[in-house]
Amino acid sequence: MSGYNSVFKKDLFKNEVVLVTGGGTGIGRCIAHELASLGATVVIAARKLDQLTATAEEIRKLGGKCDAMQINIRDSVKALELVQAIVAKHGKLTCLVNNAGGQFISPASSLSTKGFATVVDLNLNGTFNMCKAAFDGYMGEHGGSIVNIVAECRNGFPRMVHTGAARSGIINMTKTLAVEWGPYNGIRVNCVAPGTIVSSGMKNYPESVVEVVSTTDWMSPSGRYGTESEIAASVVFLLSPAASYISGVNLAVDGGSSLSKGFPEGEELAFNPEGSLMPAYVGWPEGKDNVHNLKHVDAPPKINELLDKYKKSKL
């Protein structure tokens, strides 16, 4: 397969079958492309079939193997049926990436109990449903690797208390499952916690938030935000044999931003407003290599401008 330029060995996931929930857009789409470029048979699943179909077609045009299947992760019965369908078609399910989820910006004082419960149900309960389905449908007898996409929330999550609570629950659940399921043929369960990432998810932000985000990317040790490819690469590492002795961890992929709070002089004086000296990893092909005109990131123009800037220093 040509097209997506992964930093990993091209046949790393040959003969592996990987389910990526929320795989039609944003970070999930990038994870699917990276895994397919490494030889995996990828199944992407979400509620909206049109987005899944478009991504699956992209991957197949590049020579990869990808199926699109619809799922509501809040339905535990449907989650198990999805896993069973994958095993029936492909004979196995060796890896699961729980990327599906969602939230909205709201201060806790304005958040209804229904809104809180809805986000917790989708993110926390939905992730458990998929983990349990993978265990019951295949991994309990054969082993496997699971990566849950969460968020860096150790210091709270202002304006998103619902997703902060849910993601914290997933992190604890991940550690618990790593202990309980490790004896079942070596199942490994880990988390990846992205920092601020240049992705299509930023389309959901109000314009005022996009304006602030687009002008403050330098206020961290890395001097920039992350790329979808950097999250995808972290997931690939944790799924791969290179992480065979890693289980129960929450890997923060945030350029050190979660460690950089509390400067007495303020972040404005601690970091370099001229930009980043940390090269970015961007796997999307460019120029003459982008023969299928793959769209890199479907984000607001100001966010796309940031990605263009990061590409100039990419690895």
Task: Please annotate each region the language model reported.
Residues V97, P183-R188, I246-G248:
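Short, small/polar-rich loop/turn modules that mediate ligand/substrate recognition or access, typified
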Residues Y184, C191, G195-M219, K261-V291, ...:
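A glycine/serine/threonine-rich, flexible loop-to-helix segment
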Residues V147-G169, T174-P183, T196-I197, S257:
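Catalytic loop of short-chain dehydrogenase/reductase
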Residues D136, V179-P183, S244:
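Alpha-helical segment proximal to the catalytic Tyr-Lys
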Residues R224-V253, S258-L259:
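C-terminal substrate-recognition "lid" of short-chain dehydrogenase/reductases
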Residues P107-A108, S112-V120, T216:
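Substrate-binding pocket helix/loop in short-chain dehydrogenase/reductase
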Residues V17, G22-T25:
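Conserved glycine-rich cofactor-binding loop
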